[in-house]
Amino acid sequence: MPIGVPSVPFRLPGSQYERWIDIYTRLSQERIIFLGQEVNDSIANRIVAFLLYLDSDDPSKPIYLYINSPGGSVTAGMAIYDTMQYIKAEVITICVGLAASMGAFLLASGAPGKRLALPHARIMIHQPMGGTGRRQATDIDIEAREILRIRQQLNEIMAQRTGQTVEKIAKDTDRDYFLSAAEAKEYGLIDKVIENSTMGNN
């Protein structure tokens, strides 16, 4: 049986009464966003909305983006990435579990010096995927060229974020490339491996 979204009690300031809200809404009130699924248009729209709201609420306070995601849509992920760069509030990224593909890209896109991972987290980078299906040859050619363009764009951003060369990023992402939290730090995907919440604030 699938587990539904858990609800938690919440008391409005100045009120003696509690009401139940879903845990993700409650976390957002603490400026915490949790990406815990495949990146698609629906989840991207939700995260973008949270980012925009929290930035407008107080751009001087950081936003915490926790990531445990296998990746997903490049266009949906880029919508989140662009919003992270657009807003004034810094976005601290924390990997719990797995940050793969677009999940790893978003992890590396956090505020400089504040891209974090828990000790047993795993990070995986690879090139963007594409499918041909049953389509005309000209359409397949168009998609292939677009995938190559996107791959180059992602490689350039990852090189800028990690300090690696574009050539090394291209070579390493040619196939699935897994890293431990410590290896991801050495690679430049994250800045620190943390064991408790206080370490992330230093």
Curated annotation (Swiss-Prot):
Q: Which CDD domains match?
A: S14_ClpP_2
- Quote the catalytic activity from the record: Hydrolysis of proteins to small peptides in the presence of ATP and magnesium. alpha-casein is the usual test substrate. In the absence of ATP, only oligopeptides shorter than five residues are hydrolyzed (such as succinyl-Leu-Tyr-|-NHMec, and Leu-Tyr-Leu-|-Tyr-Trp, in which cleavage of the -Tyr-|-Leu- and -Tyr-|-Trp bonds also occurs)
> Per the UniProt entry, what is one GO biological process?
protein quality control for misfolded or incompletely synthesized proteins
Keyword annotations of the record? Cytoplasm, Hydrolase, Protease, Serine protease
Uppermost EC category = hydrolase
Q: Does the keyword Protease apply?
A: yes
Residue numbers annotated as active site: S101, H126
Q: What Enzyme Commission number does this protein have?
A: 3.4.21.92
Q: Does the keyword DNA damage apply?
A: no
One Pfam annotation reads: CLP_protease
Q: Which GO terms describe its molecular function?
A: ATP-dependent peptidase activity; ATPase binding; serine-type endopeptidase activity
What SUPFAM superfamilies does its record include?
Answer: ClpP/crotonase
PANTHER family in the cross-refs: ATP-DEPENDENT CLP PROTEASE PROTEOLYTIC SUBUNIT
Q: Which family does it belong to?
A: Belongs to the peptidase S14 family.
Q: Which HAMAP family match?
A: ClpP
Binding partners and assembly: Fourteen ClpP subunits assemble into 2 heptameric rings which stack back to back to give a disk-like structure with a central cavity, resembling the structure of eukaryotic proteasomes.
Q: What role does it play?
A: Cleaves peptides in various proteins in a process that requires ATP hydrolysis. Has a chymotrypsin-like activity. Plays a major role in the degradation of misfolded proteins.
- The identity of this protein, by name, is Probable ATP-dependent Clp protease proteolytic subunit 3
Native organism: Synechocystis sp. (strain ATCC 27184 / PCC 6803 / Kazusa)
Q: Which gene encodes it?
A: clpP3
